[in-house]
Structure formats: C-alpha cells, structure tokens
C-alpha cells in the first residue's frame, strides 16, 4: 500500500499482530474502515447481523487468538456494541473497536446529520463508548 490511509495503516498494523479477521456491521460512517479492510492482505471482513453480535464474535475471537478487531458506525452502532465491548474489557481481552465517525468536513461545518440527537455535538457518544474502552483516540 503506497500512501495508506489512517484506516489502512491501522488495520495493517493490527493484522501484523496476528489478527486476521475484523468483525462488524457496514455503516455509512464506517465505510472508510470497511473499505480499508478489503485492502489489507490476509484480513477477512466478517459481516455480522448486528453490532452486539459483532462485539461478541470479536470477544470470542480474542479469547482464542489473543486479540480482535471490531468496527461499527458512529452513535447507534457503537452504542449497540457496548455490552460486548464492556465484557471484553472486564475480562481484559484486547478488542480494538474502530468506530467510523462523520467526516471532518461535516464536523467543521456543524452539519446536523443522522445518528445524532439533532445537534452538532459529534463527541457526545465518546464518554459512553470510551467508558467501555481501555484507551480511546480520535484518528483523522
């Protein structure tokens, strides 16, 4: 990959750690992550029926393989996965939860979009989802 995106680089590095599957549900804000997964050699994109199932699948994978990746979309997706993600944290399982967010352009222009509460507080869900994470970071 010449000039990889942040998503491609992140997924490639996690793949180098031996994680060969990423579990999740396609979502419009996560399409860049979903597309990047298709570009990483040896990484299988496992599409799940819903975000909670994806989180539980990642939890099970981490129990067997040592670490896992999960991807969801902003807001409704990340909140739907939270019970599985919190369970992984409780059992000290390294599950990397990658959440696709509205673009910088949308955030800078303060555009009201779907998956929010009718306002432009794009970090509203970070404290909630972040409580289920060992570490959080916003990558652009």
Predicted regions mapped to residue ranges:
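N-terminal alpha/beta PP-like core and its mobile active-site loop of ThDP/TPP-dependent enzymes
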Residues: 1-140
